[in-house]
């Protein structure tokens, strides 16, 4: 029986949507039990005097009546409910908050923009991998939070009065997707950003992380259209032109854009374009969590680990009882291969990290069965929660593990967008070879081999006589040559000349 003392809930009364996150604490980490979202569009109910309409408040209260059933099983001390931008500015927010507290039978706290920014940063820091020095961007319905920080500590907190709902009402209220409307929306966003942009740029960052529905929508579009996962200004401009071609909000159709997100997508896109331009952002990735995760981790009082991905991989190894020594052996061998070909094959630090990850969990499929273990591994990685990895990175890991041995499914590489196709395939080739050479599960049988590449032609040079001394692996390598050649990947095997 599930103990209620291990359950936690966080509710975010946003300007566009209300969200509820229910989790269970498991061995010092968070297991998600439910994510519930309702589109309330509270900000759209504000009049010129900043008073919420009765209809907007009723939409919100009805949503909370639905949420309240789930809260009955959770200790009140383990529930946090916060309200953000719209209820910060609404003149009659007390009326809404008072009734909301009665419905939920727990306090509702209207938090400041700075507190919201801090919680968003904490949620990102607990759930998103990559470099420690980061810029976090969250575009809400009525406010946008921009935060810089290093590790667990936020250094610059900003909350601006612009959001996808308020910009929709202000600059796309005629429902026309024109150059003029986008220009007005972007200009207004630039004006809002001009005071804080220099301060944020001064702080600097190594990675930019987006934590909003707009960024989630962009990821869904890019996956559907076969782009890689990095959000860049040229991609944003291209999507803007596609939106303008549609003419009207009601006719907005972009491959990968859901109907639910379509209404506020153009306004959120205009704000994001202005942010990229004002802050000179090169690229952005999707965050693993934000405000609600920040609230939950605050209740759990867990430290922020420097390397979230390492924690995730360690938990998987423990949960599925993987052979850690063998995983390390394969990883070290793959790294040795990577060092030899990284420059000509243009494999950067991002490739290095993802190859390491694949090596450390490559045997997870054995926890189901030896037969079709690579397919089992891909299935597990596709559906397990992997804090620190983006959805695109999860898909790449699943693709690598699916193709770690046996026939190569070239089509599957087109289904991932974490890396360019050619880089993903090159990582796969190195992983497959590392697994073959390490399959004796002993360090003293690993050869001192050399790799050389010319375009996609890969040549392996082994010590003289090694193939004759290791006939089973020699046979496996001959089979591997056939598999890779069948995929149009040239693989040549040779030995050093006998020393005289």
Swiss-Prot record:
Name of the protein: Guanosine-5'-triphosphate,3'-diphosphate pyrophosphatase
SUPFAM superfamilies linked to this entry: Actin-like ATPase domain, HD-domain/PDEase-like
InterPro entries: ATPase_NBD, GppA/Ppx_hydrolase, Guo-5TP_3DP_PyrP, Ppx_GppA_C, Ppx_GppA_N, PyroPPase_GppA_Ppx
Pfam families recorded: Ppx-GppA, Ppx-GppA_III
Class of this enzyme: hydrolase
Gene Ontology MF terms in the entry: guanosine-5'-triphosphate,3'-diphosphate diphosphatase activity
Pathway field: Purine metabolism; ppGpp biosynthesis; ppGpp from GTP: step 2/2
Protein role: Catalyzes the conversion of pppGpp to ppGpp. Guanosine pentaphosphate (pppGpp) is a cytoplasmic signaling molecule which together with ppGpp controls the 'stringent response', an adaptive process that allows bacteria to respond to amino acid starvation, resulting in the coordinated regulation of numerous cellular activities.
Key word Hydrolase present: yes
Homology family: Belongs to the GppA/Ppx family. GppA subfamily.
Alphabetically ordered keywords of this record: Hydrolase
Family matches, as NCBIfam families: PRK11031.1 (NF008260)
Record field: catalytic activity: guanosine 3'-diphosphate 5'-triphosphate + H2O = guanosine 3',5'-bis(diphosphate) + phosphate + H(+)
Species of provenance: Photorhabdus laumondii subsp. laumondii (strain DSM 15139 / CIP 105565 / TT01) (Photorhabdus luminescens subsp. laumondii)
PANTHER family associated with the record: EXOPOLYPHOSPHATASE, RETROGRADE REGULATION PROTEIN 2
GO biological process, alphabetically ordered: guanosine pentaphosphate catabolic process; guanosine tetraphosphate biosynthetic process; nucleobase-containing small molecule interconversion
Domain of life: Bacteria
Keyword set includes Zinc: no
Its EC number(s): 3.6.1.40
